[in-house]
Swiss-Prot record:
UniProt lineage: Eukaryota, Metazoa, Chordata, Craniata, Vertebrata
Entry GO terms, CC: acrosomal vesicle; mitochondrial matrix; mitochondrion; motile cilium; nucleus; oxoglutarate dehydrogenase complex
Protein name listed in UniProt: Dihydrolipoyl dehydrogenase, mitochondrial
The gene coding this protein: DLD
Catalytic activity: N(6)-[(R)-dihydrolipoyl]-L-lysyl-[protein] + NAD(+) = N(6)-[(R)-lipoyl]-L-lysyl-[protein] + NADH + H(+)
Residues holding NAD(+): G220, A221, G222, V223, I224, G225, V226, E227, E243, V278, G314
Maturation and modification: Tyrosine phosphorylated.
Cell location: Mitochondrion matrix; Nucleus; Cell projection, Cilium, Flagellum; Cytoplasmic vesicle, Secretory vesicle, Acrosome
Amino acid sequence: MQSWSRVYCSLAKRGHFNRISHGLQGLSAVPLRTYADQPIDADVTVIGSGPGGYVAAIKAAQLGFKTVCVEKNETLGGTCLNVGCIPSKALLNNSHYYHMAHGKDFASRGIEMSEVRLNLDKMMEQKSTAVKALTGGIAHLFKQNKVVHVNGYGKITGKNQVTATKADGGTQVIDTKNILIATGSEVTPFPGIMIDEDTIVSSTGALSLKKVPEKMVVIGAGVIGVELGSVWQRLGADVTAVEFLGHVGGVGIDMEISKNFQRILQKQGFKFKLNTKVTGATKKSDGKIDVSIEAASGGKAEVITCDVLLVCIGRRPFTKNLGLEELGIELDPRGRIPVNTRFQTKIPNIYAIGDVVAGPMLAHKAEDEGIICVEGMAGGAVHIDYNCVPSVIYTHPEVAWVGKSEEQLKEEGIEYKVGKFPFAANSRAKTNADTDGMVKILGQKSTDRVLGAHILGPGAGGMVNEAALALEYGASCEDIARVCHAHPTLSEAFREANLAASFGKSINF
């Protein structure tokens, strides 16, 4: 999300937006947050201002569409920016620094401190400062690109009409040629466990705890569970994650990577109970919570007591009170809006992107869909290869992957070869004393084409983008191995793994 903001700000300062050629109507001059007696006329109305919605709105305006973005919350940016990706990364980053200083890491580097104290209020303040700057950045981009921001709960009240209802009951009608639904997702509730965002919390509450709990239980060891569990474990909590599946890291992660990832997290002090289900939770008179668990296949019950219970069992599409039923748009069995390859619903001028449609619930996937969708409205080509959408877990070390896992290739009967390179053999990782993990490359046996990349280690989230580029343009393992990579860098491990996949041997391992 930050990268888009920087690009747009940079382009705007240089005046590029004014030079974009198009054959459409001029941009809207309606001021932001307008509430008028008369309807607003628009070419495109976007409902939701998360990563998919705000990027789509800006792109639509750049293409010459008169654009309105309706957002129910006071701040722009959706879940990702306000209570998701952005604040969690601030806490992950700062808790990692604290963990390094508080443990033996700094001392081993010759940095000695007599006393290290945690100021949780200050840490939360830094998180909020980052969020505020980025939400304000989107508002600035809307103004710069002449996107009309209407604050209110958007409902589709006709195939060419959206009505926004604000908190005081006032309404604004938007008459529009096209409607783009980008309302995102919400936390999936756990049956029988009531979230109070105090001691029984969702990911939202876990980002704003007032103190470090002595003991925390996390339901779910997927991406969100291990990220937020890591934050509080680093800050001093005794954290146990209970996971129904037999591995950590969620859906799509390569099993070899998952096992190594779990081992590293356990070494840091994170505890796991895999193949285990939560059957209930009871709040006691002393404020503590008894969490009942048993084997996923059934068996003897066990109780774990904690101060904070974090529920992280996933997210579900948010389509509440959108007016879909009245329009005859039915949801699929998983609550998603069915769309075609151009992101059109059964009503051709009503589109949907992001978490409300099929595919991974990722901010960058929503961004891509938003851009491609509005380009399609303007007559452009519409194409997205979901196999090239990367996934990242922002723990330390990071985990990132794109393309197929070994398990998927075996299931699909595709013959493949494997190239691996450990960070322990990478010079930059050695100098940084940060050598856990490896790069694993999967290439097609017959063609050498890259089929998947799986990275566990420092900087994995940045490195995976090189793999995504390779997959998007059909590169071979040899193609990557022959690209000169700067030395000493962590990305040399990526080159070496591709060399091992293509040639059978790496140079430095």
